[in-house]
Amino acid sequence: MSRRELLGHGAAMTGGLLALGLFAGQASAAVRSVSTSTPRTRLAKAAERLLQETSPDFLVDHCHRSVELASLIVAAGNIALDEEVLFVGVLLHDLGLTQRFHSSEVRFEVASANAARDLALDYGLSAARAANVWDVAALHATGGISDFKSTETAVGSDAIGRDVVGYGLDGFDPDVVARIMETRAGFAEPFVQAIVADLQDKPQVASSTWMTTIAAKYIPGFHQNDIEQRALADPWENP
């Protein structure tokens, strides 16, 4: 399902919206806070514990908001998907920015996805569902790709992006959005600095990605790979 299709379903809603089925208390018509809800599955509970144990507050809040925005998108479009996969992939999509899951070799999205998939497998998810968790986390910042993967991946990327840059929220109940976004103020600066910290020992992974401008601004000596020049300089280009 492409993001265009998802957005096409995102008309304004009346009344409250139910949170994802992973949460208790669905009899209430109000969207419940992730931080105070109790997930129904062992994996969902473990994912919440892992997030809380490893992540600073600004990332915990961002991941909670992203899950709740995903629930709005799902409810608005009456979208059928694997709620547990969506929940775990979105909740853990930034683990790679934490000290525990930092990798000196791969992008933080991949480190996050690896950790999320490992947790999913440890709690009994099938290889296919765990691979989908990996996609949700790894591809969350690649809208042009995630749109054409699973529905869970498309919804997750859409929700996470809405929290980071604030687009596409005017189609939802403004009171619900205001409650979800109460913790959003002051997120951007520590988020950017977390990316900078993660890139210090692997600045090259930012080249030709959405992190390029951050690396160029904050990391001395960062050099953006020029794919055009490298392709033209390939010795096989002019044998």
Residue ranges of each PLM-predicted region?
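Divalent metal-dependent phosphate-bond-processing catalytic cores, especially two-metal-ion Mg2+/Mn2+ enzymes
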Residues: 8-19, 54-60, 64-79, 125, ...
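An active-site-proximal "capping" alpha-helix that borders the catalytic cofactor pocket
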Residues: 107-122
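Short alpha-helical hairpin
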Residues: 30-48
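N-terminal twin-arginine translocation
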Residues: 1-5, 15-31
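Acidic/histidine metal-binding catalytic segments
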Residues: 80-84, 124-136
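His-Asp-centered metal-binding catalytic motifs of divalent-metal-dependent phosphohydrolases/nucleases
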Residues: 84-102, 108, 112, 134-143
